[in-house]
């Protein structure tokens, strides 16, 4: 939304608002900066109808579709074992969606203990990545095998290392964890 008008553009992929346009953060904030808003945004056809459903529209515009798309890309289905890298809003939405899909086991890894507590209270297994324990060992302690059927990265380029490397920004860390956590013949998203 912009301050003067309620707007949306279904033609713009969310990737356009990533690091390629600079450090514009706050897509889930009350206000955000949209580069090139003069052509990136279109008015809602019916502003009053949009405002009545704004909470539903906000959820469907970013967090849940991103979470669900990652699960679909990874081939999550009934009975799958799933590793979710990241317990932020998108990772938590993915954990809830994986449960609705019927995943047999949902494991969420993160450094933030409060976020991990949230997903644990919702029935997921958790992995505290600040511990100096290899991810495969932590997965094996939960499942009895060191790998999952499907894994998805909901961290991206803000990833950090595991354990004693947790203070270091390592953009490749989350995707490397996802790849290492997935069994041969499994899939990632």
Could you describe each region identified by the protein language model?
Residues 37, 111, 156:
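Flexible loop residues that form catalytic
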Residues 74, 117, 121-189:
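Glycine-rich cofactor phosphate-binding loops and adjacent beta1-alpha1 units
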Residues 22-23, 97, 142:
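A general structural signal for stabilizing positions within well-ordered secondary structure
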Residues 4-42:
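Glycine-rich phosphate/adenylate-binding loop and adjacent beta-alpha elements
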Residues 43, 49-132, 137, 152:
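Mid-domain Rossmann-like dinucleotide-binding core that forms the NAD(H)/NADP(H) cofactor-binding site
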């Amino acid at each position: 939304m912009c301050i003067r008008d309620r707007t949306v553009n279904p033609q713009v992929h969310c990737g356009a608002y990533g690091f390629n346009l600079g450090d514009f953060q706050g897509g889930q904030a009350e206000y955000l900066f949209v580069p090139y808003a003069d052509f990136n945004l279109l008015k809602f056809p019916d502003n009053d109808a949009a405002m009545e459903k704004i909470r539903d529209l906000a959820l469907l515009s970013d967090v849940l579709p991103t979470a669900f798309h990652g699960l679909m890309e990874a081939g999550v289905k009934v009975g799958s074992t799933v590793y979710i890298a990241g317990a932020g809003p998108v990772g938590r939405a993915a954990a809830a969606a994986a449960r609705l899909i019927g995943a047999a086991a949902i494991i969420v890894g993160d450094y933030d203990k409060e976020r991990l507590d949230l997903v644990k209270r919702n029935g997921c297994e958790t992995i505290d990545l600040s511990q100096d324990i290899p991810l495969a060992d932590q997965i094996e302690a939960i499942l009895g095998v060191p790998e999952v059927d499907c894994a998805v990265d909901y961290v991206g380029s803000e990833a950090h290392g595991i354990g004693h490397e947790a203070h270091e920004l390592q953009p490749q860390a989350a995707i490397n964890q996802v790849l290492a956590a997935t069994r041969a013949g499994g899939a990632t998203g």
